[in-house]
Amino acid sequence: MKSVALVTEYNPFHNGHLYHAQQSKSITNSDISIAIMSGNFVMRGQPAIYNKFTRAKMALRAVDLVVELPAYASVSAGQYFAKTAVQIADYLNVSHLSFGSESGNMDDFLSLAQSIDKIEQSPLFLEKLKEGKSYPRILSELITDNDLLSSPNNTLGLSYVRAIQTYAPSIQPWTISRFQSAHHDNEISHQTFASGTSIRQSLMNQTDLWKDVVPCEIHKHYERPHISIEDTFNYLKYAILSQDATSLAQIYTMSEGIENRILQTIEQATSFEHLMTLLKTKRYTYTHIQRLLMNILLNFKKHDEPASINAVRILGMSERGQQYLKQIKKSFPERNFVTQVNKQNANLFTNEIHATKIYNLISGQTANDFNTPVIRI
């Protein structure tokens, strides 16, 4: 069976995701579509608005298989996020990887990837890296004549292409043009499509504007309890105050003494937003700081990075998805696909189990990695 992977967050699932999944499967002529989905925390440095089990149920409206992107990668910047997703796609023996972009032109991505390979070897690139500038910022400064880097989705798409070239050259990348709404639009202004940001805003404001841009079949899942980043504040504050600077310095993505700034400002902060205002500097992007704070909350350390992919957690599957897994196991019997976490395999998903515990502590929910079996449709 031919398969296409989609790297997703589905935070939450909406019509744009359905369109992407359908188009990806059709254009690549695939038999199976696989969502490699972030768990309970997402790339922007936030808890997902719904837990991973609810979002997996939503996803099965469009795909045949939902697997979990490891938690460490889910709260990482584009390069590591993409690398891990591509390695999982390769582990799942996929033929294609499809991503949404404003460009919609695969040749543009392939050409720019080739140019960046050369740029990264230049002394100027290395000099800017030593200055502490973020990778996206360096590229935007050195590549001024290419609009491809002007949007987050295009930049992430480029990371997928480069990760495929490095770690899984047998996978064919493909891009689908994003429809209508921009990634960070704050308001729902279209009758069929809207950004995840605007949908989350609608939910937080307790309006029902989201109903027009979400498949009717999953409206029931939207009625479930949801959380926001502000809900993490008291737990985050405790996590920071219970450590000293030496301990905080070991947190994943902590650098250049920012742990001291965090300790100096945390007692003044009255909310997550207030803390972000106190911490914001020209040196670091808003998202970088937000991710860093989630790493503190989750207690992810620099040495916790998984060495390789040696198992994949299956969150949900259709009958066709189950058939596909059986096909892979027949060809690669050593590969480990886990549909139920238990005492025997829990050591393979330490970070994910911990992230779920923290998410449940914040949200008051009880669905965890041990008591929630694989979702089947």
UniProtKB/Swiss-Prot annotation:
It catalyses: cytidine(34) in elongator tRNA(Met) + acetate + ATP = N(4)-acetylcytidine(34) in elongator tRNA(Met) + AMP + diphosphate. GO terms for biological process: tRNA modification. The keyword tRNA-binding applies. InterPro entries: Rossmann-like_a/b/a_fold, tRNA(Met)_cyd_acetate_ligase. ATP binds at residues 7-20, 100, 153, 178. GO terms for cellular component: cytoplasm. It is found in: Cytoplasm. It is an enzyme of class 6 (ligase). Its EC number is 6.3.4.-. One of its GO terms (molecular function) is ATP binding. Keywords: ATP-binding, Cytoplasm, Ligase, Nucleotide-binding, RNA-binding, tRNA processing, tRNA-binding. It comes from the Bacteria. NCBIfam families: PRK13670.1. Belongs to the TmcAL family. Catalyzes the formation of N(4)-acetylcytidine (ac(4)C) at the wobble position of elongator tRNA(Met), using acetate and ATP as substrates. First activates an acetate ion to form acetyladenylate (Ac-AMP) and then transfers the acetyl group to tRNA to form ac(4)C34. This is tRNA(Met) cytidine acetate ligase. The gene is tmcAL.
